[in-house]
Amino acid sequence: MEQSKKYLKLSSIAVLALAFFSMLQLVSELLFGDINQAAIPEGAPDNILLITRIILFAVAFLLMLPNIYIGIKGMRIAKKPNASKAHIVWAIILLAFACLNIIEPVVTCVSDGMKSENISAVLSIAVEITVFFEYIKYAMDVRKNVA
């Protein structure tokens, strides 16, 4: 239980870093016009924003892996004889939804580059972290009811 709280805190920090970086880019775009020119220091490689974004995505995703493990563990709990079929279906839906919606923004940003229209995809990761929070609370409730 303590370990899951630690991972939730780390995931929250990663999401805050992503949100802060996205807002910084958005503000620089509003102030200077071209996001790719405004935030790049002189002499830096042209794709430094994309590289920074990919690093932040990688950190956030690695911090979410324990949450995925907790979700799978919650599915195992839902498979116990006292659990209803609704528990199992709900666990599968939440886990699949969270995993797909974490991967999709990363693929979009890597394939299309960091354009201003992709900022919403980046910020959607924060929404998916919320899904993980809800899923973990649900898995813990199932554990209390079934165990």
Describe the predicted segments one by one.
Residues 2-7, 68-86, 129-147:
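Cytosolic juxtamembrane helix at the C-terminal end of the final transmembrane segment
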Residues 9-15, 97-141:
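Alpha-helical membrane-associated segments of multi-pass integral membrane proteins
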Residues 25-40, 72-75:
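Membrane-helix exit/juxtamembrane interface segments
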Residues 34-52:
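Perimembrane loop-to-helix junctions flanking transmembrane segments
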Residues 49-67:
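A loop-to-helix transmembrane entry motif
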